[in-house]
UniProtKB/Swiss-Prot annotation:
UniProt site positions, description: Cleavage: G120, F121
GO MF assignments: microtubule binding; phosphatidylethanolamine binding; phospholipid binding; ubiquitin protein ligase binding
InterPro entries: Atg8-like, Ubiquitin-like_domsf
UniProt-annotated location(s): Cytoplasmic vesicle, Autophagosome membrane; Endomembrane system; Cytoplasm, Cytoskeleton
Lipid group attachment sites (Phosphatidylethanolamine amidated glycine): G120
Propeptide section residues: 121
Record organism: Homo sapiens (Human)
Subunit note: 3 different light chains, LC1 (a cleavage product of MAP1B), LC2 (a cleavage product of MAP1A) and LC3 (produced by one of the MAP1LC3 genes), can associate with the MAP1A or MAP1B heavy chains. Interacts with TP53INP1 and TP53INP2. Directly interacts with SQSTM1; this interaction leads to MAP1LC3A recruitment to inclusion bodies containing polyubiquitinated protein aggregates and to inclusion body degradation by autophagy. Interacts with ATG13. Interacts with ULK1. Interacts with TBC1D5. Found in a complex with UBQLN1 and UBQLN2. Interacts with UBQLN4 (via STI1 1 and 2 domains).
SUPFAM superfamilies: Ubiquitin-like
This protein's UniProt keywords: Autophagy, Cytoplasm, Cytoplasmic vesicle, Cytoskeleton, Lipoprotein, Membrane, Microtubule, Phosphoprotein, Ubl conjugation pathway
Source species, domain of life: Eukaryota
Region (Important for interaction with ATG13 and for autophagosome formation) location: 49-53
Name of protein: Microtubule-associated protein 1 light chain 3 alpha
């Protein structure tokens, strides 16, 4: 079971930077992404892991499908994937473009997921 603490609190900045460098050296066509459940989320389950290496050609709609499948959600369950806890990006946007615009200073791309109700829509 993953820790309740966010990834950034479990690893030092230096360790995260080093890990990204190793990932990018070994897998230059993969984007290092951290996906965690939104802190106030109650309806959606917790993912079995938080770190993903996403092929750079994948777009957001494909990533959403992958995460929905990992969470074993049914088609009617609301699901939102936000970049840096605030940005909803177009589902057609390639993950490589999002990475270039939104990556953290440690080199990871951070995302959170939540159900629609969490944001009061």
């Amino acid at each position: 079971m993953p820790s309740d603490r966010p990834f950034k609190q479990r690893r030092s900045f230096a360790d995260r930077c080093k890990e990204v460098q190793q990932i990018r050296d070994q897998h230059p066509s993969k984007i290092p992404v951290i996906i965690e459940r939104y802190k106030g989320e109650k309806q959606l389950p917790v993912l079995d892991k938080t770190k993903f290496l996403v092929p750079d050609h994948v777009n957001m709609s494909e990533l959403v499908k992958i995460i929905r499948r990992r969470l074993q959600l049914n088609p009617t369950q609301a699901f939102f994937l936000l970049v840096n806890q605030h940005s909803m990006v177009s589902v057609s946007t390639p993950i490589a473009d999002i990475y270039e615009q939104e990556k953290d200073e440690d080199g990871f791309l951070y995302m959170v997921y939540a159900s629609q109700e969490t944001f009061g829509f």
